[in-house]
């Protein structure tokens, strides 16, 4: 293999410029060699910052790094769904692969349901690769990388991280380690469920309206957590307007928010109602007594450039303290949204 200038690649991709196809080939070969040595469940030590769906929103990914810290100073775990729907899936995925190549221990990437040949041919990544590179070659290289991504991660042996959720076929994390992950995402079975399932306020298991995976209730997650000695499950997969969600908590309440700006002093007579919705700059720490058995992290602000949601990253310290850092979309000058361009059908 020839030497890759990873710093040059990072600069090009961060500025929304494509790297040559020959660089993509070598980058994918190098990352494949790294991933093939990784387990189905990657062990990660805290502190770590956990990130949810990105969906090709490159400039919002750069905003995430701005507020979360640059790698390798900050250790990152991304929960999949790097591509599709956004305008810059190619640059987004290649940027993350370049970081993985340069900092393999500080950048962990696991598979989402959109890291799939079938799904990317429907929701945009395939078409984007063909449009930007003139053929489907880059898409094929990336799809091979999809097959080698881990299915989950375990932080300090206490926090199970997965893209979607649980499976009725899986009662222990050791069972996940035995799965053959180096394949296209199956239409059913344990591997499919891990990438597609969702928590829901039901008892036991339910059919998923997605047509893949399952819905699972608080009782299911509590049994799984107890059997595997887990504190909680961290997952992504679902748009959350507030950027994060605590599932199956005994407490339904607003949590204290801390901003980087000093709060203004208001006397009681002049105080006006306060909007308790999370806002960019807020840091929300969940009290131990109010933790749920499952949390959702969503990291694509203003999803599809029209949903109006904020996003979050989950910062875990050595005690598994949950601190959600809220952020919004990149400024208009840096957002990179093409102008005078119709929204493709797959956004609707």
UniProtKB/Swiss-Prot annotation:
Active site: 114 (proton donor)
Enzyme Commission number: 3.1.3.16
Gene3D superfamilies xref list: 3.60.21.10
Region (Disordered): 259-282
Cofactor: Mn(2+)
Catalytic activity from the UniProt record: O-phospho-L-seryl-[protein] + H2O = L-seryl-[protein] + phosphate; O-phospho-L-threonyl-[protein] + H2O = L-threonyl-[protein] + phosphate
Protein name: Putative serine/threonine-protein phosphatase C26H8.05c
Organism: Schizosaccharomyces pombe (strain 972 / ATCC 24843) (Fission yeast)
């Amino acid at each position: 293999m020839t030497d890759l200038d990873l710093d040059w690649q990072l600069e090009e991709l961060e500025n929304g410029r494509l790297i040559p196809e020959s660089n993509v080939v070598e980058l994918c070969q190098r990352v494949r060699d790294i991933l093939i040595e990784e387990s189905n469940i990657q062990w990660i030590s805290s502190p770590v910052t956990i990130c949810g769906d990105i969906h090709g929103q490159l400039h919002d990914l750069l905003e995430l790094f701005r507020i979360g810290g640059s790698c390798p100073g900050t250790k990152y775990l991304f929960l999949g769904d790097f591509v599709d729907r956004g305008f810059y899936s190619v640059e987004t995925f290649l940027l993350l692969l370049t970081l993985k190549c340069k900092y393999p221990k500080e950048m962990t990437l696991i598979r989402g349901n959109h890291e799939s040949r079938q799904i990317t041919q429907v929701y945009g990544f395939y078409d984007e690769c063909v449009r930007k590179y003139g053929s489907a070659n880059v898409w094929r290289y990336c799809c091979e990388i999809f097959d080698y991504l881990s299915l989950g991660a375990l932080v300090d042996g206490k926090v199970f991280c997965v893209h979607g959720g649980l499976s009725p076929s899986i009662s222990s994390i050791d069972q996940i380690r035995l799965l053959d992950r180096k394949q296209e995402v199956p239409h059913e079975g344990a591997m499919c469920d891990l990438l597609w399932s969702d928590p829901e306020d039901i008892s036991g298991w339910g059919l998923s309206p997605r047509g893949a995976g399952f819905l699972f209730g608080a009782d299911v997650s509590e049994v799984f957590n107890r059997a595997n000695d887990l504190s909680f499950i961290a997952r992504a997969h679902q748009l959350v307007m507030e950027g994060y969600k605590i599932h199956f908590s005994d407490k339904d309440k607003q949590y204290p928010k801390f901003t980087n700006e000093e709060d203004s002093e208001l006397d009681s007579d002049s105080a006006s109602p306060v909007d308790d919705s999370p806002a960019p700059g807020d840091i929300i720490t969940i009290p131990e007594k109010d933790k749920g058995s499952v949390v959702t992290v969503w990291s694509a602000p203003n999803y599809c450039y029209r949903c109006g949601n904020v996003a979050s990253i989950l910062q875990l310290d050595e005690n598994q303290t949950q601190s959600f850092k809220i952020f919004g979309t990149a400024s208009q000058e840096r957002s990179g949204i093409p102008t005078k361009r119709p929204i493709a059908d797959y956004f609707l």
